[in-house]
Regions:
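N-terminal beta1-alpha1-beta2 submodule of the flavodoxin-like/Rossmannoid cofactor-binding fold
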Residues: 1-76, 83-85, 90, 94, ...
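Conserved beta-strand segments of alpha/beta enzyme cores
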Residues: 26-28, 128-131
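Short, well-ordered alpha-helix to beta-strand connector turns
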Residues: 71-72, 100-101, 127
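Redox-cofactor binding/interface segments in oxidoreductases and associated redox assembly factors
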Residues: 76-77, 105
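Short, conserved loop/helix-junction motifs that constitute active-site signature segments
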Residues: 94-100, 124-125
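Short beta-alpha junction loops
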Residues: 107-112
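Short, aromatic/basic amphipathic alpha-helical patches
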Residues: 116-125
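Glycine-rich phosphate/pyrophosphate-binding loop and the adjoining helix
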Residues: 130-158
Length: 158
């Protein structure tokens, strides 16, 4: 099964998960980056991301290459910002026009996921959502996170 992992990660947690899934499933990886990505303090990131969620801003992305029709399974992962999936995924989904595909979703968070997965699924309407997962601080969680990622990814490969 040809698989793609699409990920946006600001602090590295979602990239950590995506890299593990890529390795386990021999998948292609597409890393999304905003055009104005900058190093900010933790509070600066909180304000920047929370502001985008609050005001419904879809940030511009750096160019990426992805052809949905080339894949049987598309796995997407983003951090949770203000109880929602990070806005860069909205920009991506608007442009990529993914429809009728098998989709698996994951989010990374620091302790509160809110309705992020519910909102993420709504953004992917018109697709078959086959799995979802949330990973709490996967980099800090070490072996426990690695086991959770492995178990989830293996379930996708069936």
């Amino acid at each position: 099964m040809k698989t793609a992992v699409i990920v946006y990660s600001l602090d590295g947690n979602c990239s950590f998960v995506a890299e593990k899934i890529k390795s386990l499933l021999n998948a292609d990886l597409v890393q999304l980056h905003t055009k104005n990505e900058k190093k900010r303090s933790k509070f600066g990131n909180f304000a920047w991301g929370g502001g985008m969620v609050t005001f419904g801003i879809k940030p511009r992305l750096k160019p990426w290459t992805f052809i949905p029709s080339a894949y049987d399974l598309i796995i997407m992962g983003v951090p949770v910002w203000a109880g929602s999936p990070a806005p860069p995924i909205k920009t991506f989904l608007s442009a990529a026009r993914i429809n009728g595909k098998k989709i698996a979703l994951f989010v990374c968070h620091g302790g509160g996921m809110g309705n992020a997965l519910k909102k993420f699924k709504a953004l992917c309407a018109g697709n078959d959502i086959i799995a979802e997962a949330d990973f709490k601080e996967p980099i800090k969680s070490g072996n426990a996170a690695l086991k959770q990622i492995e178990d989830w990814a293996k379930g996708l490969g069936r």
